[in-house]
From Swiss-Prot:
GO terms for MF: SUMO polymer binding; zinc ion binding
Official protein name in the record: Sine oculis-binding protein homolog
A GO cellular component annotation in the UniProt record: nucleus
Region (Disordered): 1-26, 308-339, 413-484, 550-646, 730-771
Organism taxonomic ancestry: Eukaryota, Metazoa, Chordata, Craniata, Vertebrata
InterPro entries recorded: RAI2/SOBP (IPR026092), Znf_MYM (IPR010507)
Biased composition (Pro residues): 460-484, 739-754
Amino acid sequence: MAEMEKEGRPPENKRSRKPAHPVKREINEEMKNFAENTMNELLGWYGYDKVELKDGEDIEFRSYPTDGESRQHISVLKENSLPKPKLPEDSVISPYNISTGYSGLATGNGLSDSPAGSKDHGSVPIIVPLIPPPFIKPPAEDDVSNVQIMCAWCQKVGIKRYSLSMGSEVKSFCSEKCFAACRRAYFKRNKARDEDGHAENFPQQHYAKETPRLAFKNNCELLVCDWCKHIRHTKEYLDFGDGERRLQFCSAKCLNQYKMDIFYKETQANLPAGLCSTLHPPMENKAEGTGVQLLTPDSWNIPLTDARRKAPSPVATAGQSQGPGPSASTTVSPSDTANCSVTKIPTPVPKSIPISETPNIPPVSVQPPASIGPPLGVPPRSPPMVMTNRGPVPLPIFMEQQIMQQIRPPFIRGPPHHASNPNSPLSNPMLPGIGPPPGGPRNLGPTSSPMHRPMLSPHIHPPSTPTMPGNPPGLLPPPPPGAPLPSLPFPPVSMMPNGPMPVPQMMNFGLPSLAPLVPPPTLLVPYPVIVPLPVPIPIPIPIPHVSDSKPPNGFSSNGENFIPNAPGDSAAAGGKPSGHSLSPRDSKQGSSKSADSPPGCSGQALSLAPTPAEHGRSEVVDLTRRAGSPPGPPGAGGQLGFPGVLQGPQDGVIDLTVGHRARLHNVIHRALHAHVKAEREPSAAERRTCGGCRDGHCSPPAAGDPGPGAPAGPEAAAACNVIVNGTRGAAAEGAKSAEPPPEQPPPPPPPAPPKKLLSPEEPAVSELESVKENNCASNCHLDGEAAKKLMGEEALAGGDKSDPNLNNPADEDHAYALRMLPKTGCVIQPVPKPAEKAAMAPCIISSPMLSAGPEDLEPPLKRRCLRIRNQNK
């Protein structure tokens, strides 16, 4: 064979890029014999008698007329014939194109009226018995051409070596290998069609004119695969089907392909007719009557209702082809079927069905139009299938899932106050199957598009429009209880109840649970859909104290009471450790201290919405009054009677009950860890005194009994104030109110964990130190601005640290009750009375750690504080 290729090379090749080989003009005897033997061997394989080469001089098949027109030279093989338009391969190879491949097979072909083996070229034609016997004719000199072609078999570009005349078309091949493979495929297909009993599909004259069959004797019975139409000499044919017609497949691969084809056809038949356009010609002849349409990009623009209303008669569908059909393939490609399945689960997009037109259509009705019958070969009673991400699902089950989804989260549908037709089931944007997939909006009223429907789920709303209480209720249901509003760092004050603020109200705004907001897992869409899910933003919240019924929100134990620092200050909801307010001096010190310690030192939440301030103030005052009304425990050293200086806050001063202290203790604990080291510094001593003030002892050192460790009166007061949140006003109030008598011993005056230990006479100082650690935490929160605001608040407090109130034991407790958030507002921090302090000490981390806890606790505490401070930095 290689010699033939060499012989066939034209002399022009010498000038071409490839080296030329000598060209022989005649086929030698050896080649003729080889061709004859090979041909006969092949014929024997397929059960034909052998053919003698001599018989091919002027072959006239007895079954065909001899006149030039009707005598079809079926396929004439020429080497290097002149280029002719070649038939695309798919029209020949695809099983669906059997009829098209042969439709023009023999029309008008025939090289000339004279026999093909004319003596002009002095060669004898060789019969190749594959399709019909083609005639091999050596290339004439004028026929020789060096033409670049794309091989009809391997689809590679190369020099044309062989061409096969297929009726009006000529197939060109780059090598003998491709040529032989193509001939073999055609021969098998022709033979299969002849023996398969498909003749009834084609008129008899069709055979006579187009595919003259070889008049050879068929020696054996052959089975033909019903899918690939190939003849396989195998006993392992797979039978499929039941009833009258049984199909035979040569392999499991063919069987599976057949099943997939049936499935695709079923899916198409169940699609609304309008969604699939007949871009592609009907599949063979048998698909013509089914009216099956394929999905195309243009079908997105068809209103779903129009598609359902149209009865797709074959005539209408045939004339409907929408848009250009670039692909000429007649098979159903998986992508087409995928598109078909997509239409069953469209996601809501701007354009949707006119709601007013389809009040009675269920949201996901994809029942096949009555006029579309299942394609041939499909069992008539099999339920239609819907493609989903999990594979084909029977349509009834799919519909049931959709209905369940619609029923399950009823609140998602919400009041369709923006929809034109409230009764329409299409107002639920979360359900699939409601609107057609994306496309240009049609001339529908704006009310029908999901964009204008109420956004019924917080996921769909852009988080840039947080719902404040004034917004219309239907727009955005409040987010789930665990998730804060999208853009608010803390719940707005207006949403907080004015009273004692029980936790349930704060934490539960009557919000629906999160579960129904999450789309059900059965929602399967073949393409990604972006569903914004609320991401919880961490908000520091003090550890809820079991003993207190007060809000475990971000508020410290003192959080119940908000004391407005300045009109602009917002309530300090989250500041636990810093319950004291600072006098102006203290504010300065506090600011410096705060600079020392990172603002995040304590667990307080510094970022509160400014709006809550006013609310917080009123709430705080009420709470403080409530707490302050009961007289302090006997150990307190006096009831909570403040001189007129602190009247408003006085009334509001909260009893420092054990519960409060427990909260403070937790809060302080966090803060203290960060600041324990600071105590050693001189400022630390001040802080301790401040802490003492909190306890009610700090001011005594300042005013009454300056402990050695406690700064002088003003200094001590200042220190105390500083330790507090760093808000001077609050601290000033605290100083005024808190006049811890030096005689008052702190509940456990035991030396504070800090290295500086206070003598029993300095119990105030020691307590101050312990408190101070707590205060340090609060100081961490203080910012420069906070100090300024504190000064303003101090003015509000209208008292000096030196005020007689400082000397009042009851006041001393309350002085610490005022807690300041850095910028938000003053929170009254309940200071336990001296007697209570002992009980409180365990509650307040600073006090238990410093006063109650032995010194041995100090090193671990300090280490812990250092670690926390570093982390905060």
